[in-house]
Amino acid sequence: MVKIDLITGFLGSGKTTFIKSLCESLGVINTMSSPTYSIVNEYNTNFKYKIFHFDLYRLTSEQELFELGFEDYILSNNYVFIEWPDLAIPYLDSYLRIIINTENNNRYLRAEIIKSS
């Protein structure tokens, strides 16, 4: 099962709203907010796992990514949702990429499962 989801789309396309809905369906019990300034939010669930929600928009280097302890998060066997994932992609073996496009006030989602060889 792929537990790392990358959510891409333009500013304002609904990435955070989509992730909040995913978190609710996965049993998140605490209040959710955008990690735009905190970079990563941690959520507890009604189950044994946690959810880590990253927003990498403000990061400018791989060094910043690893100073956050990124490797520990992706190896934790918990759910990891990442907005603006470009810096993270080279370090992921497999993931689900969800692309959000908007057109005429509608949102269109496309999902791709990516596995490294």
Roles of regions detected by a PLM:
Residues M1-I4:
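Pre-Walker A (Motif I) flank of P-loop NTPase domains
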Residues I7:
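Hydrophobic anchor at the beta1->P-loop junction of P-loop NTPases
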Residues F10:
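P-loop (Walker A) phosphate-binding loop of NTP-binding proteins
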Residues G14:
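Conserved glycine(s) of the Walker
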Residues E24-G27, Q63-L65, D72-S117:
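Short phosphate-coordinating micro-motif centered on Lys-Gly-acidic
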Residues V28-Y43:
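Short beta-strand-centered segment that lines the nucleotide-binding/catalytic pocket of NTP-utilizing
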Residues I51-L59:
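Switch II (G3) loop of P-loop NTPases
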